[in-house]
Amino acid sequence: MPSKNGPLRVGIGGPVGSGKTALTDKLCKAMREKYSVAVVTNDIYTKEDAEALVRMQALPSERIVGVETGGCPHTAIREDASINLQAIADLNRRIPDLDVVFIESGGDNLAATFSPDLADLTIYVISVCQGEEIPRKGGPGITKSDLLVINKKDLAPYVGADLEVMEHDATRMRAEKPFVFSDMKRGEGIERIVEFLTVQGGL
């Protein structure tokens, strides 16, 4: 399902601290040997996430672009995605063989969604640390994303989150749409996410 004029564009959204940057890092490292990969990160007033990915050595620095959205970060991925579309166009010019571009949104709320003009597939990341009730609270990120990632499952015992309850609620809220439990520190769940992108993205 790559875009008509370029690479598969994968939007990665979720609240602050859910693990979006850690997921982006792990996906880049898992896919960079087989595919030509790049990243666009969104921050309100800095390029902190882009700089973090460079430090993590997710990809060479020329493949990572940070955009400063100002104001509300969800505007840059939904109502007016032009700043991100321009960043992708610039990457395409510099790296014409791109297969995949990950677009990491700024930390936002459960209502954040990507414009279909910007993302071909969307991943929404939540953390068990936000409470076991998060999946049943719903919102477009929970119910409409192509893949829901429930991250930091290793911390569930420490924050009183019941993974079985979260699994039940995610199944109910998402109907047939898939979700994955993950632990980015140990890389658990990454293989399933890569498989999802490969199959659903037509890579």
From Swiss-Prot:
InterPro entries: CobW/HypB/UreG_nucleotide-bd (IPR003495), P-loop_NTPase (IPR027417), UreG (IPR004400). GTP binds at G14, P15, V16, G17, S18, G19, K20, T21. It holds the Pfam family cobW. One of its GO terms (biological process) is urea catabolic process. Gene3D superfamilies: P-loop containing nucleotide triphosphate hydrolases. GO terms for cellular component: cytoplasm. Transmembrane segments: none annotated. CDD domains: UreG. Keywords: Chaperone, Cytoplasm, GTP-binding, Nickel insertion, Nucleotide-binding. It is found in: Cytoplasm. GO terms for molecular function: GTP binding; GTPase activity; nickel cation binding. Homodimer. UreD, UreF and UreG form a complex that acts as a GTP-hydrolysis-dependent molecular chaperone, activating the urease apoprotein by helping to assemble the nickel containing metallocenter of UreC. The UreE protein probably delivers the nickel. This is Urease accessory protein UreG. The gene is ureG.
